């Protein structure tokens, strides 16, 4: 790539040099011819010699004419830019060249030669940079669409029979930033102008205690600016963020949920109140648990004798089931006692014990 650029550059400069030499030779020949005519006319009369010499001086001074103009041009990204050459009389044009120097790229050349009606390009690979129309009609340059990478210098040089004319453009590509406005949990407002070129400026309405920071530049030349604003104890409900930029101004508004930041004593109250409530609940549960355990212990102590009596009942039942003769003997004795009582009452009853 560097070799190609050097070769193209040398070719273009060689063309220009040839035209300059040809122009100078032409001017020299005209001067010599005029001088000879002047010498012949000098013999015929002094007045004619003075007139011819003055005409030659005017011609030579016109050939050495040199004009240069510099212009700074700002163009919005993704639009069309047309760069024009210096206004000159077209019949006198010999060569038109464009030199393009972009950021981090080698120079690019484009040329048009009028006598042969030919165009050449050297090291120009960007197809978005072209002639605006036919170079034999209008040698203006066109960039469509404009990208961030088109930042740089564009120079049009026209070589004419009357002299050289330069017009240099310093092209700056503008990128509008993306503007956002939000409210944080701390009661502050944050306005951000992201990925703008060049850096944007941020202002607030109403004014407050604001802190504006500019981030680092990205590889494409864009930068982000962020402003954080707070209003302290002032009762502010609505705020506006205004972003000023060469690509256009923008303003956003937001309604704050709280006009001022929460005081310190209220913050402490909001923190300690939940903790205090949790302690009360935990303490109440602990007290209820202790009182419940005490009641359980008292109930167990009161029911202890009953439990012992109940524990004896299975043994008694076991004795009864395993000693049926003991039960019959008791029934016989009971029957005899009842019989004696009946006899005492003069009642005769026949009792038959059950076997």
Swiss-Prot record:
PROSITE patterns reported for this sequence: IG_LIKE (PS50835)
Molecular function per GO: signaling receptor activity
Any one Pfam family match given in the protein's UniProt record, by short name: V-set
A biological-process GO annotation: regulation of neuroinflammatory response
Spans within the Cytoplasmic topological domain: 289-355
Job of this protein: Inhibitory receptor for the CD200/OX2 cell surface glycoprotein. Limits inflammation by inhibiting the expression of pro-inflammatory molecules including TNF-alpha, interferons, and inducible nitric oxide synthase (iNOS) in response to selected stimuli.
TM stretches of this protein: 268-288
Organism expressing this protein natively: Bos taurus
Name listed for the protein in its UniProt record: Cell surface glycoprotein CD200 receptor 1
Compartments, as annotated in UniProt: Cell membrane
Annotated segments matching region Disordered: 35-56
Keyword field contains Nucleotidyltransferase: no
Compositionally skewed regions (Polar residues) per UniProt: 35-55
All residue ranges annotated as the Ig-like C2-type domain in the record: 139-257
Gene name, Swiss-Prot/TrEMBL: CD200R1
Positions bearing carbohydrate: 46, 123, 153
Disulfide bonds: 85-156, 108-124, 191-241, 210-229
Membrane topology: Single-pass type I membrane protein
One GO CC term, this protein: external side of plasma membrane
Gene3D superfamilies: Immunoglobulins (2.60.40.10)
Family to which the UniProt record says this protein belongs: Belongs to the CD200R family.
Assembly and oligomerization: CD200 and CD200R1 interact via their respective N-terminal Ig-like domains.
Topology, Extracellular side: 27-267
Signal peptide: 1-26
Keywords: Cell membrane, Disulfide bond, Glycoprotein, Membrane, Receptor, Signal, Transmembrane, Transmembrane helix
Keyword Kinase part of the UniProt annotation: no
Cited InterPro entries: CD200R (IPR040012), CD80_C2-set (IPR013162), Ig-like_dom (IPR007110), Ig-like_dom_sf (IPR036179), Ig-like_fold (IPR013783), Ig_sub (IPR003599), Ig_V-set (IPR013106)
